[in-house]
């Protein structure tokens, strides 16, 4: 999408190493009946500082990751927390900072906290920001951590 392309370009401009993988949904659901083919994949873009940690066990594996969609009613396109945890663990170490420029349902924030990373997220839609703030706060309260979430700007 245009938004992903724009974000990818900005990350590269700032000297980050940008990678791409595909999420293949093992249980896709149709958004509407007007399309002939069911969309069962989503592109994932992730970036890290050049020379930063990368889990050697993830090398030479397929860039297509199969994972079921997450059942979460607070957002139209929630990402699976387990998939976000895999991305985070493959490309960072505990105590590193994870940045999500499109927080959506908060899956990256929850995954970051579950894997002992700090988290910075941005969400343009105030409705989803508020939902995400509450969701992340509830998720991390179960692991004994407090979340400091800056108010919507």
Where are these regions (language model features)?
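S-adenosyl-L-methionine
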Residues: 133-153
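Core catalytic lobe of class I
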Residues: 1-130
């Amino acid at each position: 999408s245009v938004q992903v392309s724009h974000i990818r370009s900005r990350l590269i401009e700032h000297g980050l190493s940008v990678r791409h993988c595909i999420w293949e949904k093992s249980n896709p659901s149709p958004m509407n009946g007007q399309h002939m083919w069911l969309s069962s994949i989503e592109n994932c873009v992730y970036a890290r500082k050049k020379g930063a940690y990368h889990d050697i066990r993830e090398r030479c594996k397929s860039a297509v990751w199969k994972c079921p969609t997450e059942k979460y009613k607070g957002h139209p396109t929630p990402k699976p927390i387990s998939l976000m945890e895999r991305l985070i663990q493959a490309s960072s170490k505990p105590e590193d900072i994870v940045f999500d420029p499109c927080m959506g349902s908060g899956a990256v924030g929850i995954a970051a906290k579950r894997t002992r990373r700090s988290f910075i997220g941005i969400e343009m839609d105030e409705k989803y920001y508020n939902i995400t703030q509450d969701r992340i706060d509830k998720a991390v309260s179960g692991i004994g951590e407090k979340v400091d979430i800056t108010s919507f700007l």
